[in-house]
Amino acid sequence: MNQVVIYTDGACKGNPGPGGWGVVLRSGALEKELFGGELGTTNNRMELLAVIEALGALKRPCAVTLYLDSQYVRKGITEWIQGWKKKGWRTASGQPVKNVELWKRLDDLVAGGGHVIDWRWVKGHAGDPGNERADALANKGVDKALGRA
């Protein structure tokens, strides 16, 4: 099984506002960078989309170490999602899960991709080179959404 290290990040200028996502994928000596953006989005949507795009870029089942600075995404996929699904995509307080269509996409990728994923939280803006690069790519995504890239 291929070993892949992934760094993801999302950014938003205003919340909601124009946003971007960035991904760094590393496998051995190979490295690939991805980014994109949307107008009228939120930081959490961009954090989710970064992970979705990263996992969607993998062509075969991989052993993935995925670094992200979003506890919302990490806890959502590792702790909360099973409860949401049991409750018909509702939170513990009975409210509809926000960004449900993205959560469903991520759940499908995690469940059906054949990947073994180690979800690792990293403090954002704390000097981690992979996270800093993903952040720069996410900001490039904001510029792209605004037509400046």
From Swiss-Prot:
Pfam entry (one): RNase_H
Keywords tagged on the record: Cytoplasm, Endonuclease, Hydrolase, Magnesium, Metal-binding, Nuclease
Binding site for Mg(2+) 2: D9, D135
Necessary cofactors: Mg(2+)
Domain RNase H type-1: 1-143
Subcellular location: Cytoplasm
Organism for this UniProt entry: Paracidovorax citrulli (strain AAC00-1)
UniProt xrefs under SUPFAM superfamilies: Ribonuclease H-like (SSF53098)
InterPro entries: RNase_H (IPR050092), RNaseH-like_sf (IPR012337), RNaseH_domain (IPR002156), RNaseH_sf (IPR036397), RNaseHI (IPR022892)
Role summary: Endonuclease that specifically degrades the RNA of RNA-DNA hybrids.
Enzyme class: hydrolase
GO-annotated biological processes: DNA replication, removal of RNA primer
EC number: 3.1.26.4
GO CC, alphabetical: cytoplasm
Protein name: Ribonuclease H
Residues reported in the UniProt entry to bind Mg(2+) 1: D9, E47, D69
Cofactor note: Binds 1 Mg(2+) ion per subunit. May bind a second metal ion at a regulatory site, or after substrate binding.
CDD domains: RNase_HI_prokaryote_like (cd09278)
Similarity comment: family membership: Belongs to the RNase H family.
